[in-house]
């Protein structure tokens, strides 16, 4: 954790969820309540088909709703895409950009991720910018070089602690059940913090740094308690309200 920084626990549903899944969002919304909600923010990013309905379910809850991606342009002939403005119009407040699955499956570059983050800023959304190394890069000892490059190229100059969250997701840990050691996570997050402070000063100190990659109730307390880890970006474990809330409530002990 980082002193004076409000943590964020975010769920990325990826390409999962139909209208029947709204019961899980409703249960999460009912479980995100003060006093913990005053100290720790919670967010679910469902598929776009559920975005507007999900925000309607959360009008009386502190639970935030966001999207999983946006186009870099505000409108136009981009079949199948969604703009940041459309997300905001559906009352979403966050958008994930640069997730490794987008970088890999859709060949998204750091330059494109940066443009998407800038589009999010223009629509007054908070961008969750994802970075992380592959297994091959890690074996070659290049993980910090990759983090440095992606932070430099993917994060816009206009980034602030209010409009930007950084999510470190080592690609080899996503959906594999394999989690880096606490020391590995601490090293990566300390490096990110130093890079952000060097570039953005106090804004860099206050930016939230999330860890993602096989986060589950059993390891949440350990991961969320690491220095400079200001929350989590959760995949599969966010699909069930009980699992997501168990991770979220790990902060009850950490903040006691």
Swiss-Prot record:
Its EC number is 5.3.1.1. It is an enzyme of class 5 (isomerase). One of its GO terms (biological process) is gluconeogenesis. Coiled coil: none annotated. Pathway: Carbohydrate biosynthesis; gluconeogenesis; Carbohydrate degradation; glycolysis; D-glyceraldehyde 3-phosphate from glycerone phosphate: step 1/1. It is found in: Cytoplasm. SUPFAM superfamilies: Triosephosphate isomerase (TIM) (SSF51351). It comes from the Bacteria. PANTHER family: TRIOSEPHOSPHATE ISOMERASE. Belongs to the triosephosphate isomerase family. This is Triosephosphate isomerase.
């Amino acid at each position: 954790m980082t002193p004076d920084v409000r943590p964020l626990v975010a769920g990325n549903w990826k390409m999962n969820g139909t209208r029947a899944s709204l019961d899980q969002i409703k249960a999460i919304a009912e479980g995100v309540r003060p006093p913990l909600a005053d100290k720790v923010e919670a967010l679910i990013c469902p598929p776009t088909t559920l975005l507007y309905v999900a925000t309607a379910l959360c009008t009386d809850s502190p639970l935030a709703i966001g999207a999983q991606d946006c186009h870099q342009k505000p409108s136009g002939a981009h079949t199948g895409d969604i703009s940041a403005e459309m997300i905001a119009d559906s009352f979403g407040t966050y958008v994930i950009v640069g997730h490794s699955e987008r970088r890999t499956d859709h060949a998204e570059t750091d330059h494109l991720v940066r443009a998407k983050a800038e589009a999010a800023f223009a629509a007054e959304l908070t961008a969750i910018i994802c970075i992380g190394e592959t297994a091959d890069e890690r074996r070659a000892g290049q993980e910090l070089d990759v983090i440095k490059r992606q932070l430099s190229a993917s994060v816009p100059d206009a980034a602030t602690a209010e409009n930007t969250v950084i999510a470190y997701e080592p690609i080899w840990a996503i959906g594999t059940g394999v989690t880096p050691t606490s020391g590995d996570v601490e090293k990566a997050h300390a490096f990110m913090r130093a890079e952000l402070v060097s570039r953005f000063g106090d804004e860099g100190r206050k930016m939230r740094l999330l860890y993602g990659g096989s986060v589950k109730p059993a390891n949440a307390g350990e991961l969320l308690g690491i220095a400079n880890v200001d929350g989590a970006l959760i995949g599969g474990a966010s699909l069930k309200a009980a699992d997501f809330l168990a991770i979220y409530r790990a902060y009850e002990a950490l903040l006691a």
